A protein has these predicted regions:
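Conserved ABC ATPase signature
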Residues: 148-152, 156
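A short, proline-enriched helix->beta-strand linker immediately N-terminal to the Walker B motif
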Residues: 167-171, 177
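The feature captures the beta-strand-to-loop junction immediately N-terminal to the Walker
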Residues: 46-48
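Helix-to-loop junction immediately C-terminal to a conserved catalytic motif
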Residues: 61
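Conserved ABC transporter NBD signature motif
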Residues: 69-77
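Hydrophobic anchor residue at the start of the ABC signature
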Residues: 162
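Short coil-to-helix segment of the ABC ATPase nucleotide-binding domain corresponding to the Q-loop/switch region
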Residues: 105-114
């Protein structure tokens, strides 16, 4: 059995959480959370408003520190790394938070190009354009490529936000209220 667990830890476990706790002042938000997510799994965390779902995602992504417990993402203990190591890990994690977080002054094309140009600077314009067209097709919004976020419905903005996350081809996707 021990060998089986070791094998899981050596490649199939993408997120491992043990006895996670997080409070804000006297409000306990997460208490004793244990979770293991394997490569290829899709997990939904359900709960009422204020139950800690967003906090859990922020801890997994390294945006918040847990009070105690361990959180490993792709084998790295998230609250033990910082700087370039944390930045490199975050590039492997796609985030889609509650708001679409689109730049209002940029077209859909520019919003989708931004993370590619910022994080993968050696891409040619043709490669960027092909990636944009592909991801827009994936979310069914090819026709919006030249529109501004203010011209889109709330659902369309949400899907463009998801497309902006997918365009980076992350190893892990974290969605906070994806619909």
């Amino acid at each position: 059995m021990e060998q089986e667990e070791e094998q899981i830890d050596n490649g199939n476990t993408v997120i491992s959480i043990k006895d996670l706790k997080k409070s804000f002042e006297n409000n306990v938000v997460l208490n004793g959370i244990d979770l293991e997510i394997l490569k290829g799994e899709n997990i939904a965390v359900l709960g009422r408003s204020g139950s800690g779902k967003s906090v859990l995602i922020k801890i997994i992504s390294g945006l918040l520190k847990p009070d105690s417990g361990t959180v490993k993402v792709l084998g790295q203990e998230v609250d033990k790394i910082s700087g370039k190591a944390l930045q490199a890990l975050r590039l492997k994690i796609g985030f889609s938070f509650q708001s679409s977080a689109l730049y209002d002054s940029m077209s859909v094309r520019e919003n989708l190009a931004f993370p590619l140009v910022r994080n993968k600077r050696n891409l040619k314009t043709k490669e960027v354009n092909m990636a944009i067209e592909s991801v827009l097709n994936d979310v069914g919004l090819s026709q919006t490529i030249n529109q501004m976020p203010s011209e889109l419905s709330g659902g369309q903005r949400k899907r463009i936000g998801i497309a902006r996350t997918l365009i980076m081809k992350p190893e892990i996707m974290l969605y906070d209220e994806p619909t």
